[in-house]
Each structure stands twice: as structure tokens, then as C-alpha cells.
Regions:
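A short beta-strand motif characteristic of beta-propeller blades
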Residues: 40-44, 104-112, 142-150, 182-190, ...
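Hydrophilic extracytoplasmic domains
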Residues: 252-338
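Sequence/structural signature of beta-propeller modules
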Residues: 1-80, 86-95, 308-338
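Repeated scaffold domains used in trafficking and secretory/extracellular systems
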Residues: 48-74, 111-124, 152-163, 192-203, ...
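Short beta-strand elements that form the blades of beta-propeller/WD-repeat-like
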Residues: 76-92, 124-130, 165-170, 204-210, ...
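Solenoidal tandem-repeat scaffolds enriched in leucines and small polar residues
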Residues: 148-253, 257-258
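Structural motif
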Residues: 89-101, 133-139, 173-180, 212-219, ...
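A generic tandem-repeat structural signature
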Residues: 99-188
Length: 338
């Protein structure tokens, strides 16, 4: 349990306070991620298949209570997350098995054909859901998915601008479209070719990688390819960043983790992945989720700092970092609002 928390603390501190412009880690300072980093004591949920997508809403689902909303059961304060299950083959190809919401510790399948989700970063409880037959929106009161808009595309990835109501979707043909007018209009983003995955940072810079598994960023200056990263990697993943990260996203390339900056530069992190999570949910910064071997693990750094988890109180690493973590905790989610 201590080890997995160390991952989260180190990632937060290195990215939120020094990632932009920070030097690469020294090899002597590498943290090697092994199976020991995933203890049973942190398991939040166990699925029937691998969890390949985790989404932690930064809105009223997790940051506020709305007494006007009724729900099938009272919330227990454990947080609401969305996740996708899939059967993975040896090459990492996905046979999707459904999109779920985890609420009050109970997983509910919302869409059999669900692929991804993205939350609105405001005081609503809006979460958009991507499926093989178009878009849906989460109905909090009835804990179900409602059809949204008129699109019928087979969507494998979805993102939303922080500063507007614009959605971006990636189809099964690996084409990217900008979706507007409440899900009724789509415009192809011609500058993005063969997108396999797409992520936005909180300044709405777009990061994606193509068939060659090399990442790109689209900013005010146009499309930039990141240089100096490993060539011909076997597997790569873009991670939705914690909200404290500015103009930067984490990127996993085989067994290494990099920070990709919006200006087209990158830094190697201090992590080497001997084993890798199948999904990451780090948006909330201090309450993070990782998926590994069909389990969802929760790391609650806030609880650690206030001493609710006794085992951590005497750990020198956390005691040394406590003031920095508390500083991160004071950064308001409201800063995300346009």
C-alpha cells in the first residue's frame, strides 16, 4: 500500500510543481513499478474483464452535493467513476464488454456497447458517453444512459474542451471529428491523421498518437511531433492529467513514462514500469484510481495526510512531502472553469 501511494505522490509532486521545464530523472532515482505496488487492501472494485478506461469526473458528481437531485440510493461519499471493461488479446486489441458507472461501491452497466466517457468540468453532473452507435449522456437521477444528439458513428474515444461545449470524437476508422450543436453536427479535423487515442489538457491543447505510436500536440502554432522519444514502441498510452498539471500530459511508452508539454518538448519521468496498469484515473489529483488485472485500486492521499490510514503516518517519505501535498490540495477545481 505504501509503494502504490509513493507512485502517486511522486507523480503529483514532480508533474504539478516541476514538470514543465524540469530536467529528466537520474537513473539512480528510478522507481521500478512491480506487482508489489498493487496490494489487495486498495482494491475498490473487481470486474469480469480487464478495465481499459477510467474516468473521474471533476464536477458535482464528486465535488458537490445537490439536494434537489434524487437518486436510486443515497451516495456514500466514496466518489463516482466511470470505467470500460474489455477482453484484451496478446497484442492489446480490445473486445469491449461494456461501459459502467461505479457508485456507492456498486458497478452498474450503462451501455453494453460503451467505449469511453468524458465529464464536464463544472458544477453540473454531466458526463458524455461514447458508444458504437453514437453519443449518450449520463442520467444521474435514474443511473442510466440517455441518447444524446443524432450521431451514429462507432466512437472509440471522446474528449471535451474545457472552455466550451465542443466535443471531440475518434471513430473506429481513426478519424477525429469536432462535435457541436448538442451532438447534432460534426466536422472532420483534417490535420489529425489515423488517431488511435486523443487527450486534451486543461488549456484545450490536443495530444494524440497515430499508427506509428508517436505522439503529437496541436496548439496555437499548429501540429508538432514530439522528438526524442523511443522509436517503434510496442505499446503506448496517453493519460488524462491530474487537474493540477498545466499544459502537460503523462505518456506511457513501453516501460517508461514521459511528460509531454504543450510546447512540443518532453521529459522522462522517474518511473520504469515492470508491470503496467491497464487504465489510469488521476484527474482528481489526490484521490487516484488505477486498473490492474481486472481490479480498480483507489489511492486516497487526502486520507493519508489527515492520518486516516494509520500505516502511512510514520512514513518519512510522506512526512517530507506533506506540505507540498497540502499545497496541491488547496488548489481549487474552480480554476478549471472558463
Amino acid at each position: 500500500m505504501i509503494i502504490l501511494t509513493t507512485i502517486t505522490v511522486t507523480l503529483l509532486l514532480s508533474s504539478a510543481t516541476t514538470a514543465i521545464g524540469a530536467p529528466s530523472s537520474n537513473e539512480d532515482e528510478l522507481t521500478i513499478i512491480t506487482e508489489d505496488f498493487f496490494p489487495d487492501s486498495l482494491i475498490k472494485y473487481t470486474g469480469a474483464y480487464d478495465i481499459v478506461q477510467l474516468v473521474v469526473p471533476l464536477n458535482a458528481l464528486n465535488f458537490a452535493k445537490d439536494s434537489d437531485d434524487s437518486s436510486p440510493e443515497s451516495d456514500d461519499g466514496t466518489g463516482v467513476i466511470f470505467f470500460v471493461e474489455a477482453e484484451l488479446d496478446d497484442k492489446g486489441n480490445k473486445d469491449y464488454k461494456g461501459l459502467y458507472v461505479l457508485r456507492n461501491g456498486k458497478g452498474t452497466k450503462l451501455l453494453e456497447n460503451g467505449r469511453d466517457a468524458v465529464a464536464v468540468n463544472d458544477d453540473s453532473k454531466t458526463v458524455y458517453l461514447a458508444a458504437s452507435d453514437g453519443l449518450y449522456v449520463y442520467n444521474y437521477k435514474e443511473n442510466k444512459a440517455d441518447k444524446y444528439g443524432t450521431l451514429t458513428d462507432n466512437i472509440i474515444d471522446i474528449e471535451k474542451e474545457n472552455s466550451s461545449n465542443v466535443l471531440y470524437i475518434v471513430t473506429d476508422k481513426h478519424e477525429v471529428y469536432k462535435v457541436t450543436d448538442e451532438g447534432t453536427k460534426k466536422t472532420k479535423v483534417e490535420k489529425i491523421k489515423n488517431a488511435q487515442q486523443l487527450v486534451l489538457d486543461y488549456s484545450d491543447n490536443i495530444y494524440y498518437y497515430g499508427e506509428d505510436k508517436q505522439p503529437y500536440v496541436i496548439n496555437a502554432e499548429g501540429v508538432k511531433k514530439f522528438v526524442g522519444l523511443p522509436e517503434n514502441p510496442t505499446s503506448v498510452t496517453l493519460i488524462k492529467p491530474p487537474f493540477v498539471m498545466e499544459d502537460c500530459v503523462p505518456f506511457v511508452s513501453d516501460d517508461k513514462v514521459y511528460y509531454l508539454n504543450a510546447n512540443g518538448t518532453s521529459q522522462l519521468s522517474e518511473f520504469q514500469l515492470k508491470v503496467k496498469p491497464t487504465a489510469y484515473g488521476m484527474e482528481a489529483a489526490l484521490i487516484d484510481y488505477f486498473a490492474y488485472k481486472k481490479h480498480i485500486y483507489e489511492v486516497n492521499l487526502l486520507a493519508i495526510i489527515v492520518g486516516e490510514i494509520k500505516d502511512f503516518v510514520e512514513v518519512n517519505f510522506l512526512k517530507d512531502k506533506a506540505s507540498s501535498i497540502q499545497s496541491i490540495a488547496t488548489r481549487s477545481r474552480s480554476g478549471l472553469h472558463p
